[in-house]
Amino acid sequence: CIRDSLIVSPVSLKSTVLNLIDEEIKKGENGRIFVKINSLTDAEIIDKLSQASCAGVKVRMVIRGICCLLPGIPNKTGNIEISSIVGRYLEHSRIYCFGTGADEKMYISSADFMTRNTERRVEVACPVYDEKLRAKIHAIMDVVLCDNVKARLLTPEGVYVKKERTEPRLDSQEFLMEQAEKFADE
């Protein structure tokens, strides 16, 4: 039953996320984490992501707003890459992926990784099981990670810098809006 699979804060969301990160830590260099959220301020999650990085886990995050983790610091967050996309649209989608292939656990959620969201608000993360939906979410992740127009990379110094512009130019928000319009016309 899908209801039994939901992770809900303040009851189980934070502990589940921490456990999922621990699972990736056990995989070491084969571990993978992708997170798309608006804010990252929860100290326990930040510490656990740093542990994952030190274990060799590759962590890619797209965080639109507040981010209290500095990526790329040797022996601390060297395996973490963080980008931010601020464009025409306010981002509301939140995606968490842990692992790869058949072992990947994917969630869509209402929760940012902020203490107020993980401990004091009612928020939900829903696992994604349907292969077609998973493929669509992976396609969205790929587009967001390839944005070379609006995306900015967070440096170890806490400065956001433009991603190197390559061809073809890709504004992820515009591209995804065009895709949504095409889908609506079908």
Language-model features, listed with the residues they occupy:
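Short, small-residue-biased leader/transition segments that mark boundaries at the very start
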Residues: 1-2
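PLD/PLD-like phosphodiesterase catalytic module centered on the HKD motif
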Residues: 9-186
